Regions:
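Short active-site-adjacent structural elements
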Residues: 30-32, 75, 158-161, 186-190
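Surface-exposed coil loops of outer-membrane beta-barrel proteins
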Residues: 1-49, 118-123
Length: 190
């Protein structure tokens, strides 16, 4: 998710390609009114936690695999549901061989919502909504330096019984086909 949030994180030194990151992050308010999740007071009693482990390797068949998690206790959604956890897990792999790069990524969560962290993560009765998604991508760099690529991604948010006819976004998908030519080291023509 591309939400901005304050955090303190520690990343281990690289241990022959293996590394871990653990962090404590600013709590998010899942009950805030308005169009986006909020970092103000309300259901922000406890900090969130996140972490990731990864392994990278080099050579003719270079790549990286990773797995991560997010967890935050959420309080005050309803009087009957005083406390619950929002959780998410992710896994991914990226590999390169010669001029070809392949990426696959997936995630699954409960109470984390979609579009923005904790946005629409719970229904009005305080029940968690399940979310999952991922993407696949393939790119190829031709000898002139131009990169050709295709990518497809999907993000889903499941309904609960209290959601009938509420207009909740059920699924977002995106297909991208592109050509990217470097004009300078830091500027690409798309």
């Amino acid at each position: 998710y591309a939400d901005w949030n304050g955090q303190i994180a520690y990343t281990t030194p690289n241990m022959n390609g293996l590394s871990f990151t653990l962090g404590v992050m600013q709590p998010w308010n899942s009950t805030a009114s308005g169009a986006v999740s909020d970092a103000s007071t309300g259901s922000t009693d406890t900090f969130g936690f996140q972490g990731q482990g990864s392994y990278s390797w080099t050579g003719d068949f270079a790549g990286k695999i990773w797995a991560g998690f997010f967890q935050q206790e959420v309080t005050g959604i309803t009087a009957a549901n005083s406390s619950t956890d929002a959780t998410a897990f992710e896994v991914g792999v990226s590999t390169s061989i010669y001029n070809i790069n392949l990426v696959a990524y997936g995630y699954s969560g409960e109470g984390v919502g979609t579009t923005a962290l904790l946005r629409d993560g719970f229904d009005t009765a305080g029940n968690k909504r399940d979310s999952d998604g991922g993407y696949v991508q393939a790119t190829y760099v031709i000898p002139t330096g131009t990169k050709l690529g295709v990518s497809y991604g999907v993000s889903k948010l499941d309904d609960n019984a209290a959601d009938a006819g509420d207009g909740l976004v059920k699924e977002n998908t995106m297909l991208t086909i592109g050509a990217y030519h470097p004009l300078t080291k830091h500027l690409n023509l798309v």
